[in-house]
Amino acid sequence: MAPAQNQITSKHVAVIGAGPAGLITSRELRREGHSVVVFEREKQVGGLWVYTPKSDSDPLSLDPTRSKVHSSIYESLRTNVPRESMGVRDFPFLPRFDDESRDARRYPNHREVLAYIQDFAREFKIEEMIRFETEVVRVEPVDNGNWRVQSKNSGGFLEDEIYDAVVVCNGHYTEPNIAHIPGIKSWPGKQIHSHNYRVPDPFENEVVVVIGNFASGADISRDIAKVAKEVHIASRAREPHTYEKISVPQNNLWMHSEIDTTHEDGSIVFKNGKVIFADSIVYCTGYKYNFPFLETNGYLRIDEKRVEPLYKHVFPPALAPGLAFVGLPAMGIVFVMFEIQSKWVAAVLSGRVTLPSTDKMMEDINAWYASLDALGIPKRHTHTIGRIQSEYLNWVAKESGCELVERWRGQEVDGGYLRLVAHPETYRDEWDDDELIEEAYNDFSRKKLISVDPSYYLENGR
């Protein structure tokens, strides 16, 4: 940690977004003594986790004039991280066994996550800092290191304000990334990105190709298989010869290597040589980072899903500490990442912790990029740090002077990932890490975060 010699100061900070990252960041900023205004374009907290049956007017979300929907949640979604690890460290995501309106499962549905987020906002009185139905349309640096934030409310009124700092928490699951497929422009079938997928009904009796086989791809392919004639998964992570029948009750799901080409007769050719005639393609191919409101005078750019340059995925050196990002990395312990990153941002803004010089931060960034290159890791995976998530979070925690990440959190998430890969149909309901669950609830008890004996959760959780 780099403790500052300067006097502790309170800053006027704008936070963009009232999803989990924005809510947690706002709490930490206020705890550090800053005054905070949160801008949220929707009517409620929750961000991504606010489910809506609506979707973008363009199913591929390529048309810049399309009507947009922020959420990418599908109706059947359940978490892919266990609730013990998912919650904020001083506000655990506890099951409500006595409330039938809540989902008490270890891997709950999206409505339970939204309820937890709403509970968090109420508990810490975050909503009093939020301007709902207010969209940020422009953020730009001005004199003296300050920032101009232009916002537009539901009535269309534009307002310009000056802030000492801006923390961007707008999420990165809204702007779809579409994989390039040879011949796709002349292929006649339907195409949709998972951002716009909600329920399987539109695919009834169809032959469907799902591109991508990680969390959303595994979920959506099996969801569609309930109603489709056939579902074929195309995965670039598989060997070119891959062709496997996947066991599902409907007996209609296959795994392939990636697509080689498509044709105007409706055929799709996989690199394993198999040919099918499909009705629809669903792209489960991830998302792009997107900050359409942000003007940085060329100091920050996005290149192949790399937001650069960013010191430790948070601070752009030339603009720090007045501009910061919370929540960019892809990892399993997401809410805890929001918490630890925002503690660091809050401490730096108050002057309690100092950053290295601009040159030192750039040296660190370039060393990180060089290490990725040496390992052959593509630029698009710059912010994919799941394998080193505990190491990264503990480094940030030490910088901000807060508690390190509990051992059991990383172990739960890593074990869950292995189960997801090996048993995507059952990993949420069958597990073999009860000792980690016990360790988690004993930890909550020691910290006086639960008022009943840990055995209550252990016995009812099964």
Curated annotation (Swiss-Prot):
One Pfam match:
FMO-like
Assigned EC number? 1.14.13.237
Top-level lineage group: Eukaryota
The reaction(s) catalysed by this protein are: a (Z)-omega-(methylsulfanyl)-N-sulfo-alkylhydroximate S-glucoside + NADPH + O2 + H(+) = a (Z)-omega-(methylsulfinyl)-alkyl-glucosinolate + NADP(+) + H2O
Gene3D superfamilies, per database record:
FAD/NAD(P)-binding domain
Look up keyword Flavoprotein and say if it applies: yes
Q: Membrane-spanning residues where? A: 318-338
Q: What happens when the gene is disrupted?
A: Increased accumulation of methylthiopropyl glucosinolates in leaves and seeds.
Q: Does the keyword NADP apply?
A: yes
**Topology of this chain in the membrane:** Single-pass membrane protein
Q: Cellular component per GO? A: membrane
InterPro entries, per database record: FAD/NAD-bd_sf (IPR036188), Flavin_mOase (IPR000960), Flavin_mOase-like (IPR020946), FMO-like (IPR050346)
The alphabetized UniProt keywords are: FAD, Flavoprotein, Membrane, Monooxygenase, NADP, Oxidoreductase, Transmembrane, Transmembrane helix
Which residues of this UniProt protein bind NADP(+)?
A: G212, N213, F214, A215, S216, G217
Where in or outside the cell it occurs: the entry states: Membrane
Q: Name one GO biological process term.
A: glucosinolate biosynthetic process
What is a single molecular function from GO for this protein? 7-methylthiopropyl glucosinolate S-oxygenase activity
Extent of the signal sequence: none
Q: Which positions bind FAD?
A: G17, A18, G19, P20, A21, G22
Q: What class of enzyme is it?
A: oxidoreductase
What is its induction behaviour?
Down-regulated at late stage by auxin.
| Other notes | In contrast to cv. Columbia, cv. Landsberg erecta has predominantly propyl C3 instead of butyl C4 Met-derived glucosinolates.
The job of this chain, per UniProt, is described as: Catalyzes the conversion of methylthioalkyl glucosinolates of any chain length into methylsulfinylalkyl glucosinolates. Prefers probably short-chain methylthioalkyl glucosinolates in cv. Landsberg erecta.
Family as reported in the entry's similarity comment: Belongs to the FMO family.
Query: This chain belongs to which protein, by name?
Result: Flavin-containing monooxygenase FMO GS-OX3
Organism equals: Arabidopsis thaliana
